[in-house]
Amino acid sequence: MTLSVSVIIPSFNRASVLPRALNSVLAQTHGAAEIIVVDDGSSDGTNALVERDYPRVQLLTQCNRGVSSARNAGVSLSTGEWLAFLDSDDEWLPEKLNPK
């Protein structure tokens, strides 16, 4: 069974830890259909980091409206059949997206 999963990562001033989160998604044994980072008004270079180091990742930038707004913005942009949310300071084990 193939699942189309959109991964949504809200982020606010987390450029120092965001790579760990993104790398854990990219290392999934069952890859995500899309990865969306919603930058919630960061001033620490989050946008530049994602654009430079993660060209496969969709980046959505908004004014700081909080994590719930960032998640909702990611949902609006997503195209997957399933949604998976990851906080920008967290990471997944490689089997997280495997259908069970």
Protein language model annotation of sequence segments:
Residues M1-K100:
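Nucleotide-sugar donor-binding/catalytic module of glycosyltransferases
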